Amino acid sequence: MTALNKKWLSGLVAGALMAVSVGTLAAEQKTLHIYNWSDYIAPDTVANFEKETGIKVVYDVFDSNEVLEGKLMAGSTGFDLVVPSASFLERQLTAGVFQPLDKSKLPEWKNLDPELLKLVAKHDPDNKFAMPYMWATTGIGYNVDKVKAVLGENAPVDSWDLILKPENLEKLKSCGVSFLDAPEEVFATVLNYLGKDPNSTKADDYTGPATDLLLKLRPNIRYFHSSQYINDLANGDICVAIGWAGDVWQASNRAKEAKNGVNVSFSIPKEGAMAFFDVFAMPADAKNKDEAYQFLNYLLRPDVVAHISDHVFYANANKAATPLVSAEVRENPGIYPPADVRAKLFTLKVQDPKIDRVRTRAWTKVKSGK
């Protein structure tokens, strides 16, 4: 064989080996698809997981249970893990969109708070399909200085009167008001405020007093959205919002970091408020199950989930993590409510589809103002 042929052959072999090597690496690249709420994980959680495991995470976000439910019910989600609220998970279970979790692959499950597991089990019997992640309340986020400037030093910031009493909201309109785009939660909040069952099974409660009040409030509501209010509160663009505790505290923290002089706080009203639990679940069509279990175990580590709580300002469901959560978060009664406040909290129950339809139509009417 000539030197030229030898050179040509060695180059061919080297090229073939390189191609095989690249192909092998591509074949070995593991991927995980996650669909979570916006602003609901620490900035470095996914990157740290990727670095530790070599798994590539494709991470997408949503800002309402309705958006997630639409994708789940349509089938072929393409996601390996999703994060519904427990009350939504309950009705999705009847549609068979999730697969049971194999607890033998979740050795760190023991770190979860038994009391929270019992509460979530009301929606997911025996905690068969879902792993609790974070929990919080739906309350009032407000700009302390602007609200006092409009309503005075004695503004009822500890009451739903602040935002559900028409004469108050009419005055607050000048500095900006937002409501969650979450019909189940807003209607439950209004019904509770009116002294009715927040989980009423009477269609007339939704189409009558609840809708009547919301229509009176509607002209003074700038927008309905479930994430925009975070930055708007932080920047001082709105002064009051029906929002989720962790999101409002994120707004407060962003304002402090920006040193913009905006003072944001959160209130769990004295009349009672809704508590919710968000959970990780695996869609029935999940393709990367092993990778999904690795991520769930990663989140079950106390140090990991405590770090997330410190960034998102939500209480986590991991009892072993509580001592590791910063005092700023752990000792904040708006994030970890004391017993007397917890006693006034309520949760959503799955409703008959007829009530769902009534509520959806009423919500469309409220948002349009007609």
UniProtKB/Swiss-Prot annotation:
Disulfide bond positions: C175-C239
GO MF terms, alphabetically ordered: putrescine binding
CDD domains: PBP2_PotF
Biological processes, Gene Ontology terms: putrescine transport
InterPro entries: SBP, Sperm_putr-bd
Chain sites annotated for binding putrescine: S38, D247, D278
GO CC entries: ATP-binding cassette (ABC) transporter complex, substrate-binding subunit-containing; membrane; outer membrane-bounded periplasmic space
Signal peptide (from-to): 1-26
One Pfam entry name: SBP_bac_8
UniProt-annotated location(s): Periplasm
Similarity comment text for this entry: Belongs to the bacterial solute-binding protein PotD/PotF family.
Assembly mode: The complex is composed of two ATP-binding proteins (PotG), two transmembrane proteins (PotH and PotI) and a solute-binding protein (PotF).
Function: Part of the ABC transporter complex PotFGHI involved in putrescine uptake. Binds putrescine. Imports putrescine for maintenance of the optimal concentration of polyamines necessary for cell growth in the presence of glucose.
Protein name: Putrescine-binding periplasmic protein PotF
Lineage: Bacteria, Pseudomonadati, Pseudomonadota, Gammaproteobacteria, Enterobacterales
